[in-house]
Amino acid sequence: MLLNSFGSKICGFSLYETSKPNLYRILKLNKKINFIKGDIRDLNSIQTAVNKFKPDIIFHLAAQSLVKDSYIDPHFTISTNAGGSNNILECCRLSKSLKSIVYITSDKCYENVEWIWGYRENDKLGGYDAYSSSKAASENIFSAYLESFLKQKKIGAASARAGNVIGGGDWSKDRIIPDIIRSISSKKKLVIRNPSSTRPWQHVLDPLMGYIILGMKTFRNNDYSGAWNFGPSNDKVFTVKDVVNQISKNLKINKNKFLLKNNKTANFKEARLLKLNCDKANEYLNWKPKLTSTESINLTSDWYKSYFYKKDMFTETQNQIKKYLKKYE
């Protein structure tokens, strides 16, 4: 919808309805954009889509995005995040129309030693789980294609690294805010694991705007190719417990509905501290997050509140985007 608000002609390529409810269906985006159902692990189907649509810019966001699921099915995670991303880059290499690609990975591509400083784009990549290592691998694949092929073809190519984004319309499993919303709907208690963990909470509109700026820059100037971080403001570091309390307050839910529990028996490792240094984007793209952590949580709460009241969610979402874009005027 953000691209649509700029008047872009859009074609989406994705697996179909990976969650229920589904934002694509809620907003009836099938009436607004072209859509091709497909799996990025299938090179031929992506190649066919690219050849048919002939894009000027590709935004690659497809992924298996859950750390927990990477322990359940590491092969699918790696084949999607590394192998599928390789397929996207191969299509870029072969494309005759493409001018730019923005290749979104994750802040978890960094080898996380849980220090207090934000990670910079030139810090060491790596991971201790299939998800994180798949993202580090996809970054290495990106670097290989950039240096070996895309520069020679004068295709602007940038990798973008963001963290835990929040926002209305997310129904993914094992994510704190969607889990809270499902708990409210089902009237069941929810166990909140690791409430003292910190995450770089930011509203999805902030990094998305960064990606669009990056797409415009690389479209016009290949010098913007390379890696870029898009993290939240450092106004306040929120713990999982902080987020639960704020959402409960906004939606007028008794916070005793949620059971806070340090999960010492989990069979997978998830890092507790991770921050990004975004000085590069601040300096060279003039990009800074427009929303504080509190504003991000409130905006997200407002979206779900409107959904519960059965409002026109296309209009509600559009209004949130319009209000956000005014911050760039």
What are these regions (language model features)?
Residues I72, A162-G169, V191-Q202, D223-F238, ...:
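Glycine-rich Rossmann NAD(P)(H)-binding loop
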Residues P178-L190, W201-W228, K249:
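Alpha-helical substrate-binding/gating segment
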Residues M1-A162, I166, A271, N319-Y324:
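N-terminal Rossmann-like NAD(P)+-binding domain of SDR-like oxidoreductases, especially those catalyzing
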Residues R41, I72, T80-G83, D129, ...:
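Residue-level signal for the nucleotide or nucleotide-sugar donor/cofactor binding architecture
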Residues S8, S293-E329:
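Amphipathic terminal alpha-helices
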Residues L29-K31, N122, F149-G156, I180-I192, ...:
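A short C-terminal helix-loop "cap" of Rossmann-like NAD(P)-dependent dehydrogenase/epimerase domains
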